[in-house]
From Swiss-Prot:
Catalyzes the isomerization of 5-deoxy-alpha-D-ribose 1-phosphate to 5-deoxy-D-ribulose 1-phosphate, as part of a 5-deoxyribose salvage pathway that recycles this toxic radical SAM enzyme by-product to mainstream metabolites. The active site is at D240 (proton donor). Pathway: Carbohydrate degradation. Substrate binds at R49, G50, A51, R92, Q199, N250, K251. Belongs to the EIF-2B alpha/beta/delta subunits family. DrdI subfamily. The gene is drdI. It comes from Clostridium botulinum (strain Okra / Type B1). Coiled coil: none annotated. It catalyses: 5-deoxy-alpha-D-ribose 1-phosphate = 5-deoxy-D-ribulose 1-phosphate. This is 5-deoxyribose 1-phosphate isomerase.
Amino acid sequence: MAELLAIKWDDNRDKLILLDQTILPNKIEYIEYDTAEGVYDSIKDMIVRGAPAIGVTAAYGLYFAAKVAPEDNFENFFKYLKEKSSYLDSSRPTAVNLSWALKVMESKALENKDKDVKEIKSILREEAKRIHEEDIEICKTIGENLITLLKDGMGILTHCNAGQLATSKYGTATSPMYLAKEKGWNFKVYSDETRPRLQGSTLTALELYEAGIDVTTITDNMAAMVMSQGKIDAVIVGCDRVAANGDTANKIGTMGVSILAKYFGIPMYIAAPTPSIDINTKTGEDIPIEERNPEEVTSRFGAWTAPKGVKVYNPGFDVTPHENITAIVTEKGIVYPPFKENLKKLFEK
């Protein structure tokens, strides 16, 4: 699946290369970026999507800003960097990895403020690359932790895309699926279509199918029936932000899946890199929810699917209550309820 990596870095040409996910599965095209403005647009327009991938992309975007920042003194350089960081951070408000990656880059600049500005620019380049490489390792470790909760022969439901296309590699929710495939396990994955942008059918189903994993696409409103038929043994989803109490923001529709899973007694697992866990956000009520273009709901494939001018409510995310979550699986280990206490302990390790 190397050809379907969401993010590539060209070290020789100093360019970020992103897979255009808005045209999948019909076309596979990559777009090159070397400016903060281009990176902003790639995040806003969902050329790149998925919290981990957004964070990595933003880190490179801030490096591109640093490249053209003033070099006369650190104060002017950092002022410019902060302005561009705020600009990039405004591209999508819900995914905490975005602000996390930008803060890491800012901190790296501050740590080296006594050095020549040109040297700081090189340091930020290496820091963006480190964030990229770290994401790959985090995803693999999450998969290794998640697979301990699964068994050969299981049926797994996932929602949206927390796969390789949402991260630097492996994915979070899909990482154990790739590892199980390597082990020779026989298992089935059911991929919710995920209205309105269809990330489950256009992205998750695509990458799993290409990897030779047994995947079946279902519409979102089929999940209850599939669960009632005993076809689902576990639900695994990713996340865009986890609050301190375990409430989890993920793609719209995830909350409904969690309610169904709880009703049918099916474990609900959140695959969460620690950068997606926001201890400073107390509960899900404090998570900002992005509202997206109404036309994502009212038109598709060049045709209107609702009356022109009809009112539309199109939040990009919902919040799954912590009561509906069986475990939050991170690269540092598996966290069980009570989440408020145990997530805090996770960061004290």
